[in-house]
Amino acid sequence: MIPNITQLKTAALVMLFAGQALSGPVESRQASESIDAKFKAHGKKYLGNIADQGTLNGNPKTPAIIKANFGQLSPENSMKWDATEPSQGQFSFAGSDYFVEFAETNGKLIRGHTLVWHSQLPSWVSSITDKTTLTDVMKNHITTVMKQYKGKVYAWDVVNEIFEEDGTLRDSVFSRVLGEDFVRIAFETAREADPEAKLYINDYNLDSATSAKLQGMVSHVKKWIAAGVPIDGIGSQTHLGAGAGAAASGALNALASAGTEEVAVTELDIAGASSTDYVDVVNACLDQPKCVGITVWGVADPDSWRADESPLLFDASYNPKEAYNVSQLLSRQHAFDLYLKLGNLLLSRLHSD
């Protein structure tokens, strides 16, 4: 029996990626050209990762892999409110300064993460009940943190995870005290603090075009933009379960319809890290003109917040997985051409037999 084209493609891909994995050195770079460079060659701005002082000073393979493979960095924790302003008016930038210095020294684009978030929030903020006080506190925090790195950060996640699963605003100190006006306050303050930075709203579970949460995000962002709120981009965290990559294209297209200049995949990890899922997400960004880049949320599985799900591109020994080698292809057309050629060879062999 002659196999169908799907079987041929699968067989060819296995052959192709197995060959790549065996041919590359198991060191900082697993290919002659970084995956960031390949992504940029397709017109995108970056393919990045995360870092902080702890991970950079842990396994030495982590900074080596970052330097060789990724073009952008986000701080995992060092720019969050509890790290930068643990006590009111007392700012601490030791961790974030370390992160920024590493990124700048190694020529990495920086995404700031995150300014206003209900989690990792000091109790002195979450206990505020007065509108004027909370407004002043928000403005001071956003302004101080952003000016610390003015001109150094490409984009900021200004507000993070502000929606419930049904698409309504999450209950938080910000929404309770200020209503949805906290979004306007945050973005207007951020624009004033660094007019050149791209300003993002960022959230998780924006992974299906038909989900209530995604639709709530789109409708709110459209409304806020129409009202003059300076939102430049929507970030989809994209923490996926196994097999969920196929919906990424529709989800990114739906987010792009909100009217922002940009969209981005900001915290990518996928349970099981299958090559199919990673390729689906990469191609979803490549196919959406407004998608500027992808940030993978961690280098190797031991450092992941989902370590037991093995969701990243590098395994527990810091070796590249098949998904890394697949991501090297980046272009769907490139991948199709390669496995079609191999498929034709297989067909010819089968017919000759």
UniProtKB/Swiss-Prot annotation:
Mutation effect (V153L): In strain: A3969.2
InterPro entries: GH10 (IPR044846), GH10_AS (IPR031158), GH10_dom (IPR001000), Glycoside_hydrolase_SF (IPR017853)
GO MF annotations, alphabetized: endo-1,4-beta-xylanase activity
Location (main, coarse): secreted
Annotated disulfide bonds: C285-C291
Protein name: Endo-1,4-beta-xylanase
Ranges that cross the membrane: none
Subcellular location: Secreted
One Gene Ontology term, aspect cellular component: extracellular region
Annotated gene: Xyn
Pathway listed: Glycan degradation; xylan degradation
Key words of the record: Carbohydrate metabolism, Disulfide bond, Glycoprotein, Glycosidase, Hydrolase, Polysaccharide degradation, Secreted, Signal, Xylan degradation
Sugar attachment sites: N4, N325
PROSITE patterns: GH10_1, GH10_2
pH dependence: Optimum pH is 5.5.
